[in-house]
Structures are given as C-alpha cells and as structure tokens.
Curated annotation (Swiss-Prot):
S-adenosyl-L-methionine binds at I18, G43, E65, D91, N110. Its main location: cytoplasm. It comes from the Bacteria. Transmembrane segments: none annotated. It is found in: Cytoplasm. It comes from Ehrlichia chaffeensis (strain ATCC CRL-10679 / Arkansas). PANTHER family: DIMETHYLADENOSINE TRANSFERASE (PTHR11727), DIMETHYLADENOSINE TRANSFERASE-RELATED (PTHR11727:SF7). The gene is rsmA. It catalyses: adenosine(1518)/adenosine(1519) in 16S rRNA + 4 S-adenosyl-L-methionine = N(6)-dimethyladenosine(1518)/N(6)-dimethyladenosine(1519) in 16S rRNA + 4 S-adenosyl-L-homocysteine + 4 H(+). This is Ribosomal RNA small subunit methyltransferase A.
Length: 263
C-alpha cells in the first residue's frame, strides 16, 4: 500500500504520513482493547493507521479527512470493510463527534499538528462521551500535556487536560517514521477520561485564570492574580498558598481553589 509517491503532502494540512504498519500497529496497541468500542480517526492520510485499527476488529471505525485527494484510497477501504468503516470528507474542527457515532468511543489518531491542541481542548468540552484518546502529538506539545508542577512544561494545557483525565506518555518517535520527515520529534500519549473532574470548578473560568497567570509565568502568583481580583493576597492567605510562588509551582487543586474564590 505505497501511495506516498502519488500524493504530494500538503504543508498547510501538516501532512506527515506514516507508511510503516509496524509503527501504526504499535500505536493502535497502546489503545488497548478496541473490539468493544467505536473508534474515531482524524487525518487518516494514506490509510496505514486505518488498516491497523480495522485489523483489530473495532465495532466501527469512522475516519475524518479534509483532503479530497485521499478519498479514493479510503473509498476502497470502505468497500473492503463493508459496514465496519465509514469515511467522512470534512474538517474535524467543524464536527461534534457526538453527532456521528455512539459511545463507547476511543479516538486513535496521528493528529495534524497545526490543529492538534485545538481539537483536544474542543473534545474536553464533552470528555465524558469518550473512554480514551491515543494520539500522536509533536513531542513539545505532548510534554506540556503530561507535565507536573515545578516543571517548565507545566502550564494551561497540562492543567486543563489533567483535571479531566489521566495522561501517560507511551513512546517518543523520531522524524524518520514519517514522510515527509518533520523537523521535530513526536510522541504518542494516552489520555484516559475520568468519570468526574478531579476537583469541582467552572472549567471556562479556570481556563481564564490559567491564561492570565501563565501569560506571565515568571511573575509571582500574587502579582498576576491582581488582574483578576482586588484581594489576591488575602485570598491566597485564606487558601494557605504561598503568595511568592510562581504559576508553575501550583497544583491543579490549588488553581481550582483560586478559581472558586474569584467572583
């Protein structure tokens, strides 16, 4: 199944194709059992991962692809796996996955890097619809998702995702597994949805608090919080949080406590 020479990857779609079924089989294996699940794949490209998923016999697989040039490849796979595989030619950013598939759902994808973070945050709005995500990201983004406090990579993305899920980095991959080769390392991560958020908080309000505080991550938390409240010092004292700490030193729970105290 070598279609690489026939399709010129589009840079504006972040197209980096994986041609090795050994690699895609490995990624799909990280998703665990899929025979009892419906699967979503975003950006299926040449279909290598698509075959790896279908060969593990999911209840159903739906792939969403924006590039019309790849339709012929996937129409053939639809014929080969009749009733099991559905191909949607569309922009994944414009689709609410709840409208096209029934749970339980796992997402397995080599995400287009230019929309990967936006997609993930969008899915967090209805994370209870999903069981898990097994996703390839640019390594720099994956490191931010799994980062813990007191780490330079820890920030808004880490907190918004980890509030709602358990995250695990599975493996790093070099550019050589892709065609064309990107200039960055890549990583596969597993995101396992929690039945409930770790802490009670207004998610959109938390997002705003994080955006404000981490926009000046080297400043002390008392300084950045003054943009959001008139009593930052008193609030931090009441929560027993050292006001000399920087945002990257605070736990998810502490950020939720702060958010809940801001009117």
């Amino acid at each position: 199944m070598n279609h690489i020479s026939k399709i010129n990857p589009k840079k504006e779609l972040s197209q980096c194709f994986i041609s090795s079924t050994h690699i895609t089989d490995q990624i799909v294996n990280y998703a665990g059992n899929i025979s009892d699940y419906s699967i979503i794949e975003i950006g299926p490209g040449l279909g290598t991962m698509t075959y790896s998923i279908l060969n593990k016999n999911p209840k159903k697989l739906i792939s969403i692809e924006k590039d019309r040039r790849l339709s012929t490849i996937h129409e053939k796979i639809v014929e080969e796996f009749q009733g099991k595989y559905e191909f949607i030619l569309s922009d994944a950013l414009n689709i609410d996955l709840r409208d096209i598939i029934e749970p339980p759902v796992k997402v397995i994808a080599n995400l287009p890097y230019h929309i990967a973070t936006t997609l993930l945050i969008k899915w967090m709005d209805y994370i209870n619809f999903f069981t898990s995500f097994t996703l390839m990201f640019q390594k720099e983004v994956a490191d931010r998702i799994v980062a813990q406090p007191n780490n330079k990579n820890y920030g808004t993305l880490s907190i918004l995702i980890q509030l709602l899920s358990n995250v695990y980095k599975m493996e790093d991959f070099g550019p050589e597994i892709f065609s064309p080769q990107p200039k960055v390392m890549s990583s596969v991560i597993n995101i396992i949805a929690l039945p409930e958020p770790r802490f009670h908080v207004n998610y959109r309000k938390l997002s705003q608090v994080l955006k404000t505080t981490f926009s000046e991550r080297r400043k002390m938390i008392r300084s950045t919080l003054k943009k959001l409240t008139n009593n930052a010092d008193e609030m931090l004292e009441s929560l027993n949080i050292d006001n000399n700490l920087r945002p990257e030193n605070l736990s998810i729970e502490q950020f939720c406590q702060i958010t809940n105290c801001i009117n």
